[in-house]
Amino acid sequence: MFLLYEYDLFWVFLIISSLIPILAFLISGVLAPISEGPEKLSSYESGIEPMGDAWLQFRIRYYIFALVFVVFDVETVFLYPWAMSFDVLGVSVFIEALVFVLILIVGSVYAWRKGALEWS
């Protein structure tokens, strides 16, 4: 027999935590003043009128560096818990982590050879 009544508190919490933000958005939408015009569409730069065009294009190099950073950040997230429990897990997990690191090294060498890490 399943004891689903033990999850009643969870469902109540889930419903209440879902209703609070929905009600906050609805109440602010009803009570907020409606103001339309050119000031609503202008960009805001710390109270100073923007000089020139407010839209800038970023070079694709920024995104490539961000992607490489995310890859190595995820590597750290996976390897840190493994390193903390290295003595408990055994040799098979060590080999799996070694394969994981080797795949990342191959990927970084590939990105380096393709010129993704060069700033020009």
From Swiss-Prot:
Originating gene: ndhC
Organism domain of life: Eukaryota
Protein's recorded name: NAD(P)H-quinone oxidoreductase subunit 3, chloroplastic
Function: NDH shuttles electrons from NAD(P)H:plastoquinone, via FMN and iron-sulfur (Fe-S) centers, to quinones in the photosynthetic chain and possibly in a chloroplast respiratory chain. The immediate electron acceptor for the enzyme in this species is believed to be plastoquinone. Couples the redox reaction to proton translocation, and thus conserves the redox energy in a proton gradient.
Alphabetical UniProt keywords: Chloroplast, Membrane, NAD, NADP, Plastid, Plastoquinone, Quinone, Thylakoid, Translocase, Transmembrane, Transmembrane helix, Transport
Organism of derivation: Pelargonium hortorum (Common geranium)
GO molecular function: NADH dehydrogenase (ubiquinone) activity; quinone binding
Catalysed transformations (reactions): a plastoquinone + NADH + (n+1) H(+)(in) = a plastoquinol + NAD(+) + n H(+)(out); a plastoquinone + NADPH + (n+1) H(+)(in) = a plastoquinol + NADP(+) + n H(+)(out)
Stretches that traverse the bilayer: 10-30, 64-84, 88-108
EC number, UniProt record: 7.1.1.-
Record-level GO cellular component terms: chloroplast thylakoid membrane; NADH dehydrogenase complex
Bilayer topology term: Multi-pass membrane protein
